[in-house]
């Protein structure tokens, strides 16, 4: 269905941009304002949930009848990016409440190497899925 195709592209694009926002805002200064809006807790939660739900939906609703695996790659990437976003949000809020600022600052400074790579993968999956809609694994 065309709706799931569009939702898959949009969810992967936004989730990938959200995860790799630090890297993208350094490279592309014109996107800094948009990426700052996506870095809020509510935006990350909604984007993560949307990526997971759309990823699950595109697994069960194929794009065309002969393509069984047509949306496999974007679906898996969308679910992975969504899980990473939700894990990041819930890790910040649930594990480290506001009464422990020193420990929270130390954890916030630790490098999250997976964020940029997984975000770039989600971004690339969205772009490839947009330009190559009827390929077997895209």
Please place each PLM-identified region on the residue numbering.
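N-terminal signal-anchor/start-transfer transmembrane helix
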Residues: 5-30
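Intrinsic N-terminal pre-sequences and regulatory tails
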Residues: 1-8, 137-138
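Short alpha-helical packing/oligomerization segments
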Residues: 63-94
